């Protein structure tokens, strides 16, 4: 894969893409979660190499997509994603979003209907307002002081252990977090949560109108992700695939099972 940059007024978005495109194969577009980067999908990129065209980004203000003015909204992230894909002549992507990446995927599908070939959610949750209690949304807007008041080593420990269950998954998450200094991390995570809350409060209609695969770690303890997925599955009549022994970063905790689930789903949709 080759590294490229997409320019915006707020900074450059760094992404990685197939060195040579395969016209007969679908595009898998991998979107990491809040504070994570492209390394989160290392095992998926290796597994699907040659089976599909691949693109993964470091979200704005994350990883190599820095410096970047951290004033973006979820809607802007979706618009930049669309513009980036259009610049690469990618018209019908399969969006693979982990956590915040899944929210960006839904915002993309709402703003650009009928563009997405399929959606794979990994430990994400629905954007529909009905799934959230008022105090949960209030809490998402007031996290900065909570984070900044904690020692950096405690933030690193809680982030790694809260997102992953395996030693490999915890180490990966900690390494991604160490890409930031404490203040930068606290500003980024609190901004991401605040913008997520604001997007949910818009009370838009988010319907999954393309083939969808819901994946969630059976030990996901990040917020209320497990509960949200149960509600989401019921609302969409689309069962959740629970990944054994995996936490919030299910694709790094148990990449073998997640890769098999994704591959079986793509085969079922006659995409690979």
Placement of each model-derived feature along the sequence:
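Gly/Ala-rich beta-loop-alpha elbow adjacent to hydrolase catalytic centers
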Residues: 97-101, 105
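Alpha/beta-hydrolase fold catalytic core
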Residues: 1-28, 49-52, 90-91, 171, ...
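Conserved loop-alpha-helix segment in the C-terminal half of the alpha/beta-hydrolase fold
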Residues: 212-246, 252
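Conserved alpha/beta-hydrolase catalytic His-Asp/Glu region
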Residues: 130-132, 150-207
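Flexible "cap/lid" loop of the alpha/beta hydrolase fold
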Residues: 110, 116-148
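Active-site loop/oxyanion-hole signature of alpha/beta-hydrolase fold enzymes
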Residues: 55-96, 260
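Conserved HGGG/HGGXW glycine-rich cap/lid loop of the alpha/beta-hydrolase fold
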Residues: 14-64, 230
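Catalytic active-site module of serine/aspartate enzymes centered on a nucleophile-bearing elbow/loop
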Residues: 236-272
């Amino acid at each position: 894969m080759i590294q490229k940059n997409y320019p915006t007024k707020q900074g450059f978005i760094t992404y990685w893409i197939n060195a040579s495109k395969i016209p007969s194969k679908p595009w898998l577009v991998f979107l990491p979660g809040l504070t994570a980067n492209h390394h989160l999908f290392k095992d998926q990129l290796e597994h699907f190499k040659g089976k599909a065209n691949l693109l993964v980004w470091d979200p704005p203000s994350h990883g190599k997509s820095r410096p970047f003015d951290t004033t973006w909204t979820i809607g802007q992230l979706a618009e930049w994603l669309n513009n980036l894909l259009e610049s690469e002549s990618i018209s019908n992507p399969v969006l693979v979003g982990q956590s915040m990446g899944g929210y960006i995927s839904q915002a993309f599908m709402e703003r650009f209907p009928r563009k997405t070939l399929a959606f794979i959610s990994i430990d994400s949750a629905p954007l529909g307002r009905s799934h959230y209690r008022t105090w949960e949304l209030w809490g998402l807007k007031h996290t900065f002081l909570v984070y900044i008041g904690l020692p950096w080593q405690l933030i690193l420990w809680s982030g790694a252990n809260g997102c992953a269950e395996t030693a490999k998954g915890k180490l990966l998450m900690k390494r991604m977090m160490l890409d930031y200094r404490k203040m930068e991390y606290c500003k980024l995570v609190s901004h991401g949560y605040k913008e997520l809350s604001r997007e949910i409060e818009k009370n838009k209609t988010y319907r999954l109108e393309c083939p969808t695969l819901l994946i969630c770690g059976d030990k996901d303890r990040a917020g209320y992700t497990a509960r949200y997925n149960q509600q989401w599955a019921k609302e969409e009549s689309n069962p959740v695939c629970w990944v054994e022994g995996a936490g919030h970063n299910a694709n790094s905790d148990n990449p073998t099972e997640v890769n098999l689930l994704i591959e079986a789903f793509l085969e079922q949709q006659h995409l690979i």
